[in-house]
């Protein structure tokens, strides 16, 4: 553990179109090489496609997708007397959100549509309907935690 003081959380401003902090975090995670305007175009473009296909408010689809992806428990490695156990632990709310965003973007990047807008909109729609590889990742994480429930008394 570091003896220095904790790093301060940076203030982030809500996005200009929806006024939502989570959308800003999502944009920042999509952004590559500091190109925020490109990330904005991708996210807003995907939201437009979602609105066209789902006939729903894109923000509600986005939040339901994140909620369906976010894990409740995960496993952490804990070394006890020469053996390493995978110990299931509850996930803090900030980490839940961060993991959901990360997994959603990773799943979208792996898809095989032509543009990132199409990939992201497809993954958002799938995740909001409890399908897609990001939701599968959460299910696998929950299965791992369930399989290792016997080691839950090693929590710290």
From Swiss-Prot:
InterPro entries, per the entry: Ribosomal_uS7, Ribosomal_uS7_bac/org-type, Ribosomal_uS7_CS, Ribosomal_uS7_dom, Ribosomal_uS7_dom_sf
Species of origin: Rhizobium johnstonii (strain DSM 114642 / LMG 32736 / 3841) (Rhizobium leguminosarum bv. viciae)
Family matches, as HAMAP family: Ribosomal_uS7_B
Gene responsible for this protein: rpsG
Family statement drawn from the similarity comment of this UniProt entry: Belongs to the universal ribosomal protein uS7 family.
Quaternary structure annotation from Swiss-Prot or TrEMBL: Part of the 30S ribosomal subunit. Contacts proteins S9 and S11.
CDD domains for the chain: uS7_Bacteria
Keyword Zinc on entry: no
Function: One of the primary rRNA binding proteins, it binds directly to 16S rRNA where it nucleates assembly of the head domain of the 30S subunit. Is located at the subunit interface close to the decoding center, probably blocks exit of the E-site tRNA.
GO terms under cellular component: small ribosomal subunit
GO MF term (any one): tRNA binding
PROSITE patterns referenced in this protein's UniProt entry, alphabetically: RIBOSOMAL_S7 (PS00052)
Any one GO biological process: translation
Keywords: Ribonucleoprotein, Ribosomal protein, RNA-binding, rRNA-binding, tRNA-binding
Protein name: Small ribosomal subunit protein uS7
């Amino acid at each position: 553990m570091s003896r220095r003081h904790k790093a301060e959380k940076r203030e982030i401003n809500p996005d200009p179109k929806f006024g939502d902090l989570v959308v800003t975090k999502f944009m920042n995670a999509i952004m590559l090489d500091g190109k925020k305007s490109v990330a904005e175009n991708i996210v807003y473009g995907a939201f437009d496609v979602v609105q066209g296909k789902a006939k729903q408010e894109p923000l509600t689809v986005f939040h339901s997708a994140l909620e369906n992806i976010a894990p409740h428990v995960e496993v952490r490695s804990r070394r006890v007397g020469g053996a390493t156990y995978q110990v299931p632990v509850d996930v803090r709310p900030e980490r839940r959100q961060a993991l959901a965003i990360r997994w959603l973007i990773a799943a979208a990047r792996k898809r095989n549509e032509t543009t990132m807008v199409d990939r992201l909109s497809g993954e958002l729609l799938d995740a909001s309907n409890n399908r897609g590889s990001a939701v599968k990742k959460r299910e696998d994480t929950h299965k791992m935690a369930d399989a290792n429930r016997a080691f839950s008394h090693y929590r710290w």
